[in-house]
């Protein structure tokens, strides 16, 4: 029978799980500080970190993130995207759905711009970040400064 990634986590040796937890705490030191708290008492940013950390415990080859910056303070958004960039560098493939185009394009290798559910543009993230249509519509005048 096929087993899920979640059940595979529990079949692993405690030492391996501890090492994975140390890696997650290395990415999210704030979770280490809050390890005795229940998830319901964490801030929105801490909950986002917890969700990503839980997913990483399963050693995924693909990590899907849907609007990781939604509702978070700008400082926490920067922290989350710095971690996404670090994860990308480890070889984990990340499928990121994000309305914050500037932050998404800074950490992406390739991007897709959707308009009413259809792909309007796609290409290397750096190319999209410099595309006048993307700048005018999604990045605004600040990108031109």
Describe every region a protein language model picked out.
Residues 38-42, 46:
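Conserved ABC ATPase signature
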Residues 78-90:
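Helical segment within the ABC ATPase nucleotide-binding domain
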Residues 1-6, 10:
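Single conserved hydrophobic/aromatic residue that forms the stacking wall/gate
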Residues 63-67:
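Catalytic Walker B motif of ABC-type/P-loop ATPase nucleotide-binding domains
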Residues 55-56:
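ABC ATPase C-loop
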Residues 110, 122:
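Short, glycine/charged-rich "phosphate-handling" switch motifs in NTP-dependent
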Residues 59:
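Conserved catalytic motifs of ABC-family nucleotide-binding domains
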């Amino acid at each position: 029978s096929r087993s899920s990634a979640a059940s595979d986590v529990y079949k692993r040796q405690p030492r391996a799980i501890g090492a994975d937890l140390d890696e997650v705490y290395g990415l999210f030191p704030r979770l280490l500080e809050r390890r005795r708290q229940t998830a319901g008492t964490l801030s929105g940013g801490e909950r986002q970190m917890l969700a990503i950390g839980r997913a990483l415990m399963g050693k995924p080859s693909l990590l899907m993130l849907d609007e990781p910056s939604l509702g978070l303070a700008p400082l926490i958004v920067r922290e989350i995207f710095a971690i996404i960039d670090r994860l990308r560098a480890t070889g984990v493939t990340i499928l990121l759905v994000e309305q914050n185009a500037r932050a998404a394009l800074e950490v992406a290798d390739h991007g897709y711009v959707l308009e009413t559910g259809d792909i309007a543009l796609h290409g290397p993230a750096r190319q999209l970040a410099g595309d006048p249509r993307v700048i005018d519509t999604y990045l605004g005048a600040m990108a031109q400064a």
